[in-house]
């Protein structure tokens, strides 16, 4: 029993997350760094109201990552938000303090910003963000911060967004960054792609897909076929995961 109590438990909450990057990443890192008392598990929730059941059943929890579709709906279950999480209105990392308080953070924006910096010597001027869910919030935050104009594309656009059917040749030509924040194209539905006019794309465009499985989505393949630069979400995930660990452990990132 004492051995069990010493375990430091971490994990991921989301829906249909067997494919997840996080469990494999952290399990390998724990092993590499000889953190034998640390364990990372997946918690697949049918609905966000199951969150408290997970907490009550796992008193050893020290931290959680949060993925689709709960990055926004998790917020009412938390005691406090970091400034960034509050501004972004989405949480992807939870820290469990010794007092029992649950603090929500957003490390997605750091991951996206760092991955984007690697692709641009100077900032992009105009962008399209495909999707308006929780994953898009960190992207919006970064683009606002660096002064990049953008339009949000949604299947059900509000007054501040546009629909996919409204993406014209003119809009594409004014854009040099297109970010897919939707799950369209994720394994196993790898033949699907966001409905944009790919024939207007060229070498002036960077296509950034937050999806990392498959490595090259149909969205990226179509962009590549038209001469675009492309990148998937792996580096963003790696950078945000390292930041999550620094929050949980209050130590520098993994070696």
Residue ranges and their predicted role:
Residues 145-162:
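NAD(P)-binding Rossmann-fold cofactor-contacting core
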Residues 2-6, 122-123, 144, 196-205:
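Short, conserved loop/helix-junction motifs that constitute active-site signature segments
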Residues 16, 156, 213:
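Residues in the short beta-alpha loop(s) of Rossmann-like NAD(P)-binding domains
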Residues 160-231, 235:
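Rossmann-like adenosine-cofactor binding region
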Residues 66-73, 134-135, 183-186, 213:
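Short glycine-rich anion-binding loops that position phosphate/pyrophosphate groups of nucleotides
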Residues 2-119:
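Phosphate/diphosphate ligand-binding glycine-rich loop within oxidoreductases
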Residues 114-115, 228-251, 255:
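Active-site capping/gating segments
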